[in-house]
Amino acid sequence: MRLLGLDVGSKTIGVAVSDPLGITAQSVMTIPIDEDRHNFGMRSLKKLVREYEANGFVLGLPKNMDGTAGRSVSRSKAMGERLEQKFGLPVYYDDERLTTVASERILVEEAGMHDRRQRKEVVDQMAAVLILQNYLDLQRKE
């Protein structure tokens, strides 16, 4: 089962894809979106679904540290509903607490990306990788 992992933000969507066996996640791209103009990146996502023959989506669910729903949960849920309607594929959710923080740390400490502008271009993709990889790991444990 091949899945697309999405880190849905207010201006961009970070995208990752699993390998065909559902073991590892790799970054793919960052899709610009414009909520005010109702541009949710569906055209780009459609191409990716076809290209990777995706069977579903994993979206990050931005919870607060105490486990309650964060402000952006509604954004992720709305995107999940759009994806289900558009593609007819299942949408799964994974707790994304601290994925952006972890992504920033990885990019600075392990990849040596100290330039904030440079990191900004890939941090959403890295967060999508972490969301998807966490989901894949949990599925293998079950």
Curated annotation (Swiss-Prot):
Segments passing through the bilayer: none
Gene Ontology BP annotations: rRNA 5'-end processing
Molecular function GO labels: nuclease activity
EC class name: hydrolase
Keywords: Cytoplasm, Hydrolase, Nuclease, Ribosome biogenesis
Gene3D superfamilies in the record: YqgF/RNase H-like domain (3.30.420.140)
Location in or out of the cell: Cytoplasm
GO cellular component, one term: cytosol
Function of the protein: Could be a nuclease involved in processing of the 5'-end of pre-16S rRNA.
NCBIfam families named among the record's database cross-references: RNAse_H_YqgF
Sequence similarity: Belongs to the YqgF nuclease family.
This protein's name: Putative pre-16S rRNA nuclease
Organism: Lactobacillus delbrueckii subsp. bulgaricus (strain ATCC 11842 / DSM 20081 / BCRC 10696 / JCM 1002 / NBRC 13953 / NCIMB 11778 / NCTC 12712 / WDCM 00102 / Lb 14)
